[in-house]
Amino acid sequence: MTCFTRVGVSCGLFFFLLGAQLQLIRCIRKDVLAGRLENVTQTISNILQGYDIRLRPNFGGEPLHVGMDLTIASFDAISEVNMDYTITMYLNQYWRDERLAFNIFGQYFDDENDDGISDVLTLSGDFAEKIWVPDTFFANDKNSFLHDVTERNKLVRLGGDGAVTYGMRFTTTLACMMDLHYYPLDSQNCTVEIESYGYTVSDVVMYWKPTPVRGVEDAELPQFTIIGYETNDRKERLATGVYQRLSLSFKLQRNIGYFVFQTYLPSILIVMLSWVSFWINHEATSARVALGITTVLTMTTISTGVRSSLPRISYVKAIDIYLVMCFVFVFAALLEYAAVNYTYWGKRAKKKIKKVKECCPGKIGKSERSETCSTTEDIIELQDVRMSPIPSLRRGTYNATLDSIGTETMNLGKFPPSFRITRNYGTGHSQLRRRAQRGISTRPRMLHALKRGASAIKATIPKIKDVNIIDKYSRMIFPISFLAFNLGYWLFYILE
């Protein structure tokens, strides 16, 4: 019994001493941390005492070397109209300022672990207003702002040896001069130009850190793919001196998918729609003309929409060539029907006049010949001749009517009033014909020479016996030509 009592007393004494030791360690630790905080506050006050923010580190000596690295947060927008792009990124700058060197304890215990760490002070961004910082700016900047939610996104970190890390997060809009000759099958190079505003290379030399850029692989753009980047540095000679400039260039490849569905595919379908008129009867004038005009206006609307999203540049772009050629194809389809209509009515009018002359070849003295020529069908045929697009045939109609059919032999009672009125137009048109003949004599000789030349050219054109041949060949020529154009277009720009 006595043995068990001694063991219990010994165990209790052991745990009591262990707890007391832990409590003592906590107290010592707390005192050390409290002393350290007091020492840090005193250290910061000491390093700022007598510190001149106007002078760069190592003033009057060797140039100060300032390291740079960037972390890309996001690409926000790229504008072809304004020739710029917007990007959000983190910029970190590194330099050494011996005036900010300090030594608190050498090593200390952290609150969360017992590992010793070197002296590093992470301070708020407001501390940057109390020390010297580089006057870094972006040479191609248009507009920038520093993020301030929930606090200003700035970082200042001091090392015991005077090393300074100065970081910030901001969004900037940078100029990017784009070459749009191959738009939208183009690729662009957009740069970030970093430079010191006031310090020349004799005072500040900037350089890229070993890992200059991060986050490019994770950045995404709706219309572009980032296929690579490169960094370089060079000296920029300006009116006020020579400055060190760091440059980061992004290689951007435009994605064609949006333009295929927004521009190219609708244009192709509109051109193919214009070919439908080749299968419509050539006498359906209203249908074919309406279809042709609709396709022309639709192509005009598409072209206007594309131009509204681009700057007003003078050179021709790839999409301009495609849209212009599509417009040419739909306009040519409309002109094709004009040729069909001209040929059809001109040929029909010639047949009518020939039939009238064959019907009444002699003088109008015999009543039976006059009755034969003066039928309802003849008058309707003369109306068709008046619709001919060839002016000479329209004028010849009235000459043949007056010369071969005597109005005194016409039995006007046999025909409806509309036909009788139509037949009475002969005198008026004969007067117009005589006036026109008098006007011709006053025209310049050059006009007559042009007419003779046009007649000679017209004589060389092969005569078409059937107007359907024009539509028949158009059904093959138009699709083949458009296919050949597309092959040449896409091969040229894709291989380029």
UniProtKB/Swiss-Prot annotation:
Cysteine pairings via disulfide bonds: 176-190
Parts of the chain on the Extracellular side: 21-258
Stored InterPro entries: GABAA/Glycine_rcpt, GABAAb_rcpt, Neur_chan_lig-bd, Neur_chan_lig-bd_sf, Neur_channel, Neuro-gated_channel_TM_sf, Neuro_actylchol_rec, Neurotrans-gated_channel_TM
A molecular-function term among this protein's GO annotations: GABA-gated chloride ion channel activity
Parts of the chain that traverse the membrane: 259-280, 285-306, 318-342, 473-494
Secretion signal, residue range per the UniProt entry: 1-20
SUPFAM superfamilies xrefs: Neurotransmitter-gated ion-channel transmembrane pore (SSF90112), Nicotinic receptor ligand binding domain-like (SSF63712)
Gene3D superfamilies xrefs: Neurotransmitter-gated ion-channel ligand-binding domain (2.70.170.10), Neurotransmitter-gated ion-channel transmembrane domain (1.20.58.390)
Cytoplasmic topology ranges: 343-472
GO CC terms in record: chloride channel complex; GABA-A receptor complex; plasma membrane; postsynaptic membrane
Description of how the protein assembles with itself and partners: Generally pentameric. There are five types of GABA(A) receptor chains: alpha, beta, gamma, delta, and rho. Interacts with Grd (alpha chain).
Family recorded in the similarity comment: Belongs to the ligand-gated ion channel (TC 1.A.9) family. Gamma-aminobutyric acid receptor (TC 1.A.9.5) subfamily.
Protein's job: GABA, an inhibitory neurotransmitter, mediates neuronal inhibition by binding to the GABA receptor and opening an integral chloride channel. Combines with the ligand-gated ion channel subunit GRD to form cation-selective GABA-gated ion channels when coexpressed in Xenopus laevis oocytes.
The protein's name in its UniProt record: Gamma-aminobutyric acid receptor subunit beta-like
Organism this protein belongs to: Drosophila melanogaster
Gene: Lcch3
